[in-house]
C-alpha cells in the first residue's frame, strides 16, 4: 500500500517544483526584458539622429500597396492605402540578453516587437510624402504602428495609413488616355549630409501592386526612381514610386459614345419623313439637338474646367454638328419647296399688274387727255357734304386662283382742271397719292457709282443650281450623312487608339 502511495506523492511533488522553477524563470525573463528596455532608453537623446556627426544615415524604404481606392480627374488626385516600412540602424539600441534567457528548444530572444508608443521614445526619421494632400493613420483597434528592434541595433518602423496624393493628369486624349501617378517619399528636414534614402531591394521594395484593381483604370506597370531635390535649404534625397495607369474605355462606350452614335443615327430618320410633315421633322431635329446637349453637359460635369480640347470633346462636338446639320437640311428643304412657290406666285402677280397698268396707259392715250399718272395704290377718298356726280371707281380682280387678295385698286384718272383747291371745295381729299419721280433727280456721279457696284456684284455672284425636286436633297442626305459619319469615326478611333 505504502509502496504505491509514496511514489505517487513523490512524482506530484517533483512536478510542482518544476512548475515553480519555470514560473520563476519566466518572471525573471520578463523582468530582464523590462530592465533591458529601460537600460536602452536610459540616457538616450531622442533629439540626435544615429551616428550624429558621422556619415549619413542610410534608411531603406519598403512599400506594400493595400488598395488603390479612387482617382479623381476633377481634383487631380488619387487615394491609396499602403504600408510604409523604414529600415535603419541605431547603435544606441543594441542589446545582449543573459544566458539565462535561453528559452530552450533552440529558441532564444534576438528581436523585440514593440507597440507604436515606443516610437515616441526613440529617434525616428521625419519622412513625409511630398505630393500628399490629406492622410490619416488607421487606429482600429489600436494605432497601426509598430517597432521591431533587433539585437544589433537594427530597427523596422512600420505603419498603415490612407493618403490622398496629387496627380497632375494630361487629359488631351481623355477617355483614351494613359496617366502616371507618383508617390514622392522624402525627408522633411534632413539633407543628404544627414540622411540618404534608398529603395530596399530596388524594385522588390514595392509589393501588392498585382493584387489591387480599379474600376476605371488598369495598372500596366510601376517603377521606382531615386532622385535629388535641390532646394534653397539644401539637397534632399527623394524616392519616387510611379504607377502607369491605362483608362478602361468600356464605361465610356456605354455611357457616352454609344448613346451619341444612336442619337446621330436617329436624326437621319427625318430624311425619310415627308417634307410637308413640318411638325414631325422639326420636333425630331430639336429633340436630337437637346439630347446631345444633355450628354455633353453630363460629361463636362465629371471633368475639371480646363482650357484645352479633349478627345471626347471632339467626338461630342462632331456628333452635335451632325444632328444640327440634319435640322438645317430640313430648313433648306422647306425653304426650297415653299420659297419656290412664293416666288412663282409673286411673279404671276407682277405680270398681271404690269398688264393692267399697260391697258390703263393705252386707254389714256386713246382718249387724248392730259392726265396725271396715279400710282397703283389704294386712294382713300374722304367724302364731304358735297359730292361730285361724275366720280367713278372700279376694282380689277388680280386673283390668280390661290385665294389671296392682291391689294391693287385702279382709280380713274383725275383731270388737270381738278386742282387741289377745287377738290377741297367739292369735298374730295386724296390721302395717299404718290407721283412718280424721275430718275433724273439722282446725281450723275452717284448713278455711275451705283452702276459700277451692280456690275461688280454680278461678277462675284455665286450661281446656285436650282433644285427642281426637293426630294433630291433628302436623297443626297440619306447617303452623305452616314458616309461622312463613318469616315469621321474611322479617323477618330484610328488616331486615338494608335496613340
From Swiss-Prot:
Annotated signal peptide: 1-23
One cellular-component annotation, GO: chloride channel complex
Disulfide bridge map: 167-181
Keyword Secreted listed: no
Cytoplasmic-side positions: 334-475
The entry's keywords: Cell membrane, Chloride, Chloride channel, Disulfide bond, Glycoprotein, Ion channel, Ion transport, Ligand-gated ion channel, Membrane, Postsynaptic cell membrane, Receptor, Signal, Synapse, Transmembrane, Transmembrane helix, Transport
GO terms for MF: chloride channel activity; extracellular ligand-gated monoatomic ion channel activity; GABA-A receptor activity
Major subcellular site: membrane
Keyword Signal: yes
Membrane topology label: Multi-pass membrane protein
InterPro entries in the record: GABAA/Glycine_rcpt, GABAAa_rcpt, Neur_chan_lig-bd, Neur_chan_lig-bd_sf, Neur_channel, Neuro-gated_channel_TM_sf, Neuro_actylchol_rec, Neurotrans-gated_channel_TM
Glycan attachment sites: 32, 98, 106, 152
Extracellular side: 24-251
PROSITE patterns xrefs: NEUROTR_ION_CHANNEL (PS00236)
Subcellular location: Postsynaptic cell membrane; Cell membrane
Segments passing through the bilayer: 252-273, 278-299, 311-333, 476-499
UniProt family annotation: Belongs to the ligand-gated ion channel (TC 1.A.9) family. Gamma-aminobutyric acid receptor (TC 1.A.9.5) subfamily.
Subunit structure: Generally pentameric. There are five types of GABA(A) receptor chains: alpha, beta, gamma, delta, and rho.
Job of this protein: GABA, an inhibitory neurotransmitter, mediates neuronal inhibition by binding to the GABA/benzodiazepine receptor and opening an integral chloride channel.
Protein name: Gamma-aminobutyric acid receptor subunit beta
Species: Lymnaea stagnalis (Great pond snail)
